[in-house]
């Protein structure tokens, strides 16, 4: 009896030790892969700069072009810039996430990805998590600069609690789009096809969301498409948080004849979107490389 108890304790100790060693190696892999991506960014800072300049141009040009458009959000009547600004924040994070697979597909074309896949990695998911972490940091840096410019234009920041929740919505979108972008890099043969798909998806996803116009201004068929767009479930909560000093997760974001949504439901939809992307990534990674 004592012998069995002793073996059981030794088995548990070995499992705990193995788990801690596994976690250590995973973090080490993650650190090295993320460090490599930041070294690439340091050598090619145009990625960071262009990710800031493009949304700024959209904010300045579209904000001026539709400044007198009769949109109304909360008590902010006829202020298109205030309406458009959350859409630009989301577009900044979305564009960076959509382009996140470009370094990976170049790694594959130059043979570096094959070296990673045959290396004794603790987990191949470190490839996904390193890209997601890097893109999250890069996107939040870009969003931070857009926020500073928005303050310069007279757009007030929301309360700290609302700001944290806004960042969390952006983080969920970044994770989901990054996952699907990396899936494209694994499935498409070369960077030419990937860039073509990115160009095809970029603007249609933006225009079919509520970034440029509210749902009330859209025809019925476009409202349905917009309700299927993950950007909408990031833009609408952030827009609400920017225009309301007090809110609840049950606060309604929009109501249509066939659909209504609140902040909490938007959060759940984005979490499901991320989980679906992660499960697809896991399945495709195994089918391709195992």
Curated annotation (Swiss-Prot):
This protein's record includes keyword Plastid: yes
Keyword annotations: Cyanelle, Membrane, Plastid, Transmembrane, Transmembrane helix, Transport
Membrane topology according to the record: Multi-pass membrane protein
Transmembrane segments: 21-41, 46-66, 86-106, 133-153, 167-187, 194-213, 261-281
GO MF annotation list: ABC-type transporter activity
Annotated source species: Cyanophora paradoxa
The protein's name in its UniProt record: Putative transport permease ycf38
Cross-referenced InterPro entries: ABC2_TM (IPR013525), ABC2_TM_bact-type (IPR047817), ABC_2_transport (IPR000412), Nod_factor_ABC_transporter (IPR051784)
Family recorded in the similarity comment: Belongs to the ABC-2 integral membrane protein family.
One GO cellular component term noted in the UniProt record for this chain: cyanelle membrane
Chain ranges of the ABC transmembrane type-2 domain: 46-284
Entry annotated with the keyword Transmembrane helix: yes
Gene: ycf38
């Amino acid at each position: 009896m004592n012998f069995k108890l002793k073996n059981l304790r030794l088995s548990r100790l070995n499992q705990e030790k193995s788990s801690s060693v596994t976690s250590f190696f995973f973090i080490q892999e993650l650190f090295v892969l993320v460090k490599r991506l930041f070294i690439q960014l340091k050598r090619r800072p145009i990625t960071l700069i262009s990710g800031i300049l493009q949304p700024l141009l959209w904010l300045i040009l579209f904000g001026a072009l539709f400044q007198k458009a009769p949109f109304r959000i909360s008590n902010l009547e006829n202020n298109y810039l205030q309406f458009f600004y959350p859409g630009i924040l989301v577009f900044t994070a979305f564009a960076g996430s959509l382009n996140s697979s470009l370094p990976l597909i170049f790694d594959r074309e130059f043979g570096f990805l094959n070296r990673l896949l045959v290396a004794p990695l603790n987990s191949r998911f470190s490839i996904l998590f390193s890209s997601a972490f890097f893109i999250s940091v890069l996107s939040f840096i870009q969003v931070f600069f857009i926020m500073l410019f928005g303050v310069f234009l007279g757009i007030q920041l929301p309360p700290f609690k609302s700001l944290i929740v806004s960042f969390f919505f952006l983080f969920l979108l970044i994770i989901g789009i990054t996952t699907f972008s990396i899936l494209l890099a694994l499935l498409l043969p070369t960077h030419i096809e990937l860039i073509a798909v990115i160009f095809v998806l970029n603007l249609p996803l933006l225009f079919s969301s509520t970034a440029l116009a509210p749902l009330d201004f859209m025809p019925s068929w476009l409202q349905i498409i917009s309700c299927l767009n993950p950007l909408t479930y990031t833009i609408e909560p952030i827009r609400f948080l920017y225009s309301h000093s007090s809110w609840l997760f049950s606060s309604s974001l929009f109501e249509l004849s066939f659909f209504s949504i609140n902040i909490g439901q938007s959060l759940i939809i984005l979490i499901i979107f991320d989980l679906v992307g992660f499960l697809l990534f896991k399945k495709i990674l195994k089918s391709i490389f195992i």
